[in-house]
Swiss-Prot record:
Residues 121-219 bind DNA. Transcriptional activator of the tctI tricarboxylate transport system operon. PANTHER family: REGULATOR OF RPOS (PTHR48111), TRANSCRIPTIONAL REGULATORY PROTEIN TCTD (PTHR48111:SF67). This is Transcriptional regulatory protein TctD. InterPro entries: CheY-like_superfamily, OmpR/PhoB-type_DNA-bd, Sig_transdc_resp-reg_C-effctor, Sig_transdc_resp-reg_receiver, WalR-like, WH-like_DNA-bd_sf. It comes from the Bacteria. One of its GO terms (cellular component) is protein-DNA complex.
Amino acid sequence: MRLLLAEDNRELAHWLEKALVQNGFAVDCVFDGLAADHLLHSEMYALAVLDINMPGMDGLEVVQRLRKRGQTLPVLLLTARSAVADRVKGLNVGADDYLPKPFELEELDARLRALLRRSAGQVHEVQQLGELIFHDEGYFLLQGQPLALTPREQALLTVLMYRRTRPVSRQQLFEQVFSLNDEVSPESIELYIHRLRKKLQGSDVRITTLRGLGYVLERGDEVG
């Protein structure tokens, strides 16, 4: 899943970016509100993590402008622990959740995955398709055993799992799995699909190519 991270503390931003990538997210990282507003207007994200106190435009105004444009992606605000008024205002202008600093990475990851579940209309922490199980703590099981995946493979399989039995285009996968700094092309998706197919071999789950539509994750005994 691709997310936007906007945090003006560069050391904290780079630390968070690294941790989120390791957890399977594709991350675009910016350090001020103007850049965040521009990317949210021009790029497609599954969710956004915004610090409130940023130069150029604060996180509250970024959220407000986002909602005025009719964009519904989930937003989590990072706030100072004492800034109760900012947290209330953030929720009132359209933020979905907030996390006071300092925080643990485990809590940030859990809150982000909860936001993704809600935005997808799902309430269960475990998603299952045949012998493939995805837990929102960030791991897959195949035939009851942990499925070894690189962060990029996991990000791609996660998108397919949330959209299981429905086709996802190559461009959609590219936009949700890679960040702006990744020097790759949409054709790179085929390489990752090939790797995932090899790892799913021997199970009742497959990734089917639908000409003109993209890829679909489905049961092996279903008509593709």
